[in-house]
UniProtKB/Swiss-Prot annotation:
GO terms for biological process: amino acid biosynthetic process; aromatic amino acid family biosynthetic process; chorismate biosynthetic process. InterPro entries: Chorismate_synth (IPR000453), Chorismate_synth_AroC_sf (IPR035904), Chorismate_synthase_CS (IPR020541). This is Chorismate synthase. It comes from Oceanobacillus iheyensis (strain DSM 14371 / CIP 107618 / JCM 11309 / KCTC 3954 / HTE831). Keywords: Amino-acid biosynthesis, Aromatic amino acid biosynthesis, FAD, Flavoprotein, FMN, Lyase, NADP. FMN binds at R130, S131, S132, N251, A252, G296, K311, P312, I313, P314, T315, R338.
Amino acid sequence: MRYITSGESHGKQLTTIIEGLPSQLPITAEDINASLRRRQGGHGRGKRMQIEKDTVDIVSGVRHGYTLGSPLSLVIRNDDFKHWTDIMGEEPMEDPSKMRRVVTKPRPGHADLNGALKYGHRDMRNVLERSSARETAARVAAGAVAKKLLKELGIEVSGYVKEIAGIEASDLPELNAQERADKANQSPVMVLDATVEEQMTNAIDQAKKEGDSIGGVCEVYVEGMPAGVGSYVHYDRKLDSRLAGSVVSINAFKGVEFGIGFEAAKRNGSEVHDEIAWDETHGYYRTTNRLGGFEGGMTTGMPIIVRGVMKPIPTLMKRPLTSVDIETKEPFKATVERSDACAVPAASVVMEHVVAFELAKALTEQFSSDQLPQLKKAIDDYREEIRCF
């Protein structure tokens, strides 16, 4: 199971193609649209969210509400394209000298300069249009399908904000995945701990007022994954490694940790590892979950807890950073595209869906998965097998 996306930020549309989905998975456009609406929410979003009202068209791979087993194609139209038809059109220009909104000034912290060097673009709009976080809408669409598959398999995934601008939300370990999702969806900053909401919104408002930006930490919590998914045999089959790669592939994410994460460096081994226990009902389990649901690159059967750190968005309104024009080689203060003061709440939704897809991919690789009933039976049989091991 895999997916690819295509499309530019101000182009006609974003497209997602998912290959390897089992047949007979119930799915509707609304299942995906609900996730797209969540991605567009959260305090601190910019004006682009007032323009785009993301909805998906399912153009192949589904018939009468069920997947066929063939590639699933999803399209999200860019409403803003009507204002960019001349700039982003696919046909050659009769007079290239009349090209508008040419970008020759790379913005620090963005892909502009590196992408121009790699692909030879003198107009860096060719870079920033694809490297834009607008593409994450297509990734959320893919993840929404994966979440529907995981739910059919008894696995729940929830994402939320853990920290913004150094303001940290308290842990609420008593909450299950659905309760976490409900709380996050009721919060303007998608946080579980309501006592820090006002502090976080004030920090976002202050950053916006000052023309600056702030980052934070997102957390994803997964319940219901059976033990032994992933592998210790080869480095590239370790599931925690694959999850880490998928998280830092999200725009502006610069770090990832599982369980207690980097805190482990400050503790003795006796305070890090999770002791093993067994009972007749559950089989093997851990008495703690400091390692976040992973040992040896495989799931332990405990909840997966993964966090990702998002840097502040580099587009600064009133405090632009210095760069160099690639045509004149003269220094300048970075130009501004529409941007958010804080996109951490929305990023928690993106991270949730990226993690969901990687987990669904791992399950369809490990278990027979041409048909959903076949996949369900294979996983149920495996759960019973390891319970009695």
